[in-house]
């Protein structure tokens, strides 16, 4: 299997939250595609945050794309100069006021690798505590919700988690918990 070769690139739309690029590419068999579009986004993060008593820190907010209100994981954009972990910690503190805990990377996923160029880093923050107030962006209106494990699992089973980049790490969390699997990077003695 060979990669495509990019012959030309041109930005056709460039805004703070969305950039569209048109590439002229050569496929491995020599065919040319003059118009292949890539959506460029910054790196994203999301956080499965649990309090010391085992409740999950979730955010409830309106999502204009689907014109509805959803309960989701805390998530956001990694700012320039930040690592994904730093961005995830900042987003959790800004959106919820929760901080601290033991952090581990759960997975790195792509929303659609055929037409987007970014990755989402999904973290587990275990043992977070309320230490401050929310510091929301101008377009954010977020309610913090604390859910039990069974309430969160029920949301997944009822298909209430519409954001695939949030559902995937949650399904993985529950799968690993239920099959006594290791978290990536854990030693054999650090099983859940």
Model region roles, listed by residue range:
Residues 153-192:
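Long hydrophobic alpha-helical segments typical of transmembrane helices together
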Residues 34, 44-46, 51, 77-165:
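Unchanged
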Residues 8-46, 52:
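Acidic, metal-coordinating catalytic segment for phosphate/diphosphate chemistry
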């Amino acid at each position: 299997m060979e990669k495509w070769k990019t012959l030309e690139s041109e930005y056709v739309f460039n805004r703070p939250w969305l950039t569209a690029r048109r590439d002229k590419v050569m496929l491995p068999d020599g065919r040319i595609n003059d118009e292949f579009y890539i959506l460029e986004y910054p790196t994203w993060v999301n956080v499965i945050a649990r309090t010391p008593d085992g409740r999950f820190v979730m955010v409830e907010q309106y999502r204009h794309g689907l014109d509805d209100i959803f309960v989701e994981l805390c998530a956001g954009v990694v700012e320039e100069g930040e690592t994904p972990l730093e961005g995830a910690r900042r987003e959790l503190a800004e959106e919820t006021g929760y901080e601290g805990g033991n952090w581990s990377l759960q997975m790195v996923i792509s929303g659609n690798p055929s037409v987007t160029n970014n990755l989402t880093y999904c973290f587990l923050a275990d043992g977070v505590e309320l230490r401050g107030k929310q510091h929301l962006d101008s377009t954010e209106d977020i309610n913090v919700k604390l859910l039990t494990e069974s309430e969160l699992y029920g949301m997944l089973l009822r298909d209430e988690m519409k954001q695939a980049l949030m559902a995937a790490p949650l399904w993985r969390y529950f799968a690993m918990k239920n099959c006594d699997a290791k978290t990536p990077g854990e030693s054999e003695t650090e099983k859940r």
